[in-house]
Amino acid sequence: MNFKSIITAVAVTALFASNTANAQVNTIDSVATSKVQHFNFDDMVSKTIGEGIKRKWFHGEKGQMTIFNLEKDAHIPWHQHPNEQITYIMSGKVKIKTIIDGKEIFVEVGAGEVIVFPENVPHEFWALEETVDLDVHVPVRQDWLSKELPDYLKKTKK
């Protein structure tokens, strides 16, 4: 198993770990209450959602997974959401502005690194080079379910 597979497995595990308290165990003798979903990211079409930003994503009942392809100098503006966000940089490097210990700081996150944003912690991204970013959000981002982009994504610039 390669490193990316391990990180993806960890991200998926984290996605559902916070929801196991209410999980129902189904056996062959019980009625299934959830639908198993199976996706192939390679077969999914990326959608351009901002200047230099492409996204493909899916969601289950409790969380979602997203792959962002960021061109060098792409920018995701300052925003926050009521979802925990786990970001794994698969390739490339980003500069992130966020708040740690009550202080606004900048941190660079490169290939193989992970940063976790608790719910409602503001953050902003700049791609320092071409970057592939895997994000997991729990719960599902309700603002992404509509066809309309969130306001902060309408302000993306390169």
Residue spans of the language-model regions?
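Short acidic-glycine-tyrosine-enriched beta hairpin
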Residues: 101-119
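Glycine- and acidic-residue-biased ligand/ion/polar-headgroup-sensing regions
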Residues: 82-95, 99
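A short, N-terminal "cap"/entry segment at the start of jelly-roll beta-barrel domains
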Residues: 21-67, 130, 148-158
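Bacterial N-terminal signal peptides
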Residues: 9-18
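Conserved short histidine dyad/triad with adjacent acidic residue
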Residues: 66-80
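Ligand-binding loop in jelly-roll beta-barrel domains
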Residues: 119-143
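Histidine-centered metal-chelating micro-motifs
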Residues: 75-76, 95, 114-124
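Bacterial N-terminal signal peptides that target proteins for export
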Residues: 1-7
